[in-house]
């Protein structure tokens, strides 16, 4: 009984709130702290960064454990409380088999940043990459990606690839147009290697995510930045011990733009965090055509447009919750290029919020609940869905069984009476009379 109680306490303590980045838990020999490098299906590849003191007491053991790549699964209780593990997360790994390089993710450290499209954690910088042609640059699609990037509050850089496919006049037109959007884009060409120095300087010593539609050259840019442009990965920088078949030191697969649709083909299937020779990491992400904008609300949308931010910086609107659609005292006028895009996105978000309000209401419960245990110590446990994880009470189960047995006995007795020859003879005699 005491052993079961002790196990229960350990189970609850492991469900404590997300670990603080400054906090270093005491590690066992079968535990380690690492970073999630890639996620595919139900498996995570984690790069070990810190191990227990008993393991690192020997220099040989230290070098053999730090930098090892582990193939991990996520603890089931984390899935129950919807504590999602993302690429880029700093995690606590337990139950490690150092021979087979396998383990289980037990907890997640607090994230300093997070993005949804694509799902990556602890991002320092966003590189929004589009192509000027093949596929052709569409202003509304570009606006949608920029709004999604602005909503994360993470520093971003806009880069336009494939400059060799358009004329100088078109290039100058896009420069002037994007400056009107309050952006200073970087122009580059992966094919001719033009403009890559500026991009490499911006991405240096940071964890950066490259986002954009399929076919704009994200994987090609990563291949150039990791190999040809940077001169290759130096031998001393190979402190990782990757597994066979991973993507850490291989070129990313690239594909051609479809000649029929004019759009790119999906060659990258999952998010991967890749080291760069000049320092930092790059996240290669699957291309998608439309960001979801799930974290953008009707009130936060305006702050995702630099034009509106500049208008309301010096003079405020008459109402705090102004949506800038012609309200009295609104300082935002409709004489700027992307105002129709703002109205279109605002209508989309308002329809989504009204649907969510009708469907889910306003009450939302946390995925974790806390109970006060011995000595007033709080323990966390998952808040499970009542109809999915809760079992029925024994009293209700017994009542259901009794009622089912009664119905069965009634049916059985009726069947027995119908087949009884004496009863049938009496019924026939009554019919003759």
From Swiss-Prot:
- Subcellular localization, as worded in the UniProt entry: Mitochondrion
User: Briefly, what is this protein's role?
Assistant: One of several proteins that assist in the late maturation steps of the functional core of the 30S ribosomal subunit. Helps release RbfA from mature subunits. May play a role in the assembly of ribosomal proteins into the subunit. Circularly permuted GTPase that catalyzes slow GTP hydrolysis, GTPase activity is stimulated by the 30S ribosomal subunit. Required for embryo development.
Q: Which GO terms describe its cellular component?
A: mitochondrion
> How cofactor binds (record note)?
Binds 1 zinc ion per subunit.
The gene name on file is rsgA
Null mutant phenotype reads: Embryo defective.
The upper taxonomy is: Eukaryota, Viridiplantae, Streptophyta, Embryophyta, Tracheophyta
Residues binding Zn(2+) are 317, 322, 324, 330
Species source reads Arabidopsis thaliana
What protein does this entry describe? Small ribosomal subunit biogenesis GTPase RsgA 1, mitochondrial
Q: How does it assemble?
A: Monomer. Associates with 30S ribosomal subunit, binds 16S rRNA.
EC no.? 3.6.1.-
Question: In which residues is GTP bound?
Answer: 212-220
Q: Which keywords does this chain's UniProt record carry?
A: GTP-binding, Hydrolase, Metal-binding, Mitochondrion, Nucleotide-binding, Ribosome biogenesis, RNA-binding, rRNA-binding, Transit peptide, Zinc
